[in-house]
């Protein structure tokens, strides 16, 4: 059975005065949540942060979304999104918002990546003092990138890389901002509500 058929279907009501919604399990069931992460949250565009938070080259921000750790990275030219795991032993690379300079270094075996996700160093990967063994291709072991789009100050990602172009996907949302000159909006402050024990569909 396909993953789509496993998801709960919303019934169409023949009576316009009757509304059917999702069953209670869709808000509290762990398996349902995992299915959402692999379908609806993987297929579309997800908001993950603001570009103004990544001002300098080397600024990084870890984000946990749809059950996956990612990291946003600013280099001299652009902002990238990567899976926040080392290509060697899958250890988390970045645990806090900070500036890493020119290199993202794994705290386990010191595998090091540049700000475009390319592997630059893999100490002793071939044995003691064997840092560049024959047959080991550095280009095959970079960070796994994630499709990203920046709309004004908002950063969006798409996990499976198959989403429609952002402007097409988000057309109904963008339409609501037609009367607002977004270029004049200025960041004022951040309201941090901490961790909220709820389901994403309530937010």
Predicted segments with their positions:
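Rieske [2Fe-2S] iron-sulfur-binding subdomain
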Residues: 1-78, 112-203
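Glycine-rich active-site/cofactor-binding loop and its immediate structural neighborhood
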Residues: 59-107, 111
